[in-house]
Amino acid sequence: MPLTARLQRRIAWFFFPSLLVVSALVLFTVAKRVHAEPKNGTQTLVFLRHAEKPAMGLGQLNCQGLNRALELSEVLPREFGKADFIFAANPSRHVEEGEGDLSYSYVRPLMTVGPSAIKLGLPVNIDFGANDTSELANELMRDKYHNSIIYTAWSHGYLPELISKVAEEASGKAANLVDDWTGDDFDSVVVVTLKWVDGKATLDYKNHKQGLNNGTEACPKST
């Protein structure tokens, strides 16, 4: 083999590992830049309390609450758009209510959005307990939710805190959008709209009504 060819070959072998390293670094930098690019879009967060409950609590809905839940499967998509994601408070949390303060699994929020989830063909995320407001607020800030409609059914005792924490996470400053959610209010819907541009959100907040008060107190009849 001529000297020049051998020299070229040695030079090539010498620089080949360096070329691989440089190429890998370039690809890593590009991939990291693409991955870190914030997702723009409009995020519509629809917050509602669970439906009506029986006098004894039972962690459960009563027949009027069941009727509301069924009606919500029509009302929510019509008024606020079809959900991409649905959350409900984890039913494994126990509540003490009724005579003797007996402990019951807290299924009310899940049952309230259950018909909507079934109708829309969606799962319900129950990873967060009713008092896990900070954790859920952090979850809702993820890029995957930045251009979506989200229904969240929760406990009225924690809804003001949850809504304020979401607003605080999105805006970066303290927020108090809802002072209180009264014990007799099953009809309110709080909608927080976040418009995301380059990782920053502008916030809009409105209080709506479902228009489902005074619903029938008898359970639906089977056909």
Describe the predicted segments one by one.
Residues 4-19:
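N-terminal Sec-pathway targeting helices
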Residues 5-9, 31-32, 65-67:
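Short, intrinsically disordered low-complexity segments
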Residues 7-10, 28, 195-198:
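Compositionally biased, intrinsically disordered low-complexity regions
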Residues 21-31:
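Hydrophobic alpha-helical membrane-insertion segments, chiefly the h-region
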Residues 34-147, 158-223:
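Active-site-proximal alpha-helix that buttresses catalytic centers in soluble enzyme cores
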Residues 149-153:
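Periplasmic-binding protein-like
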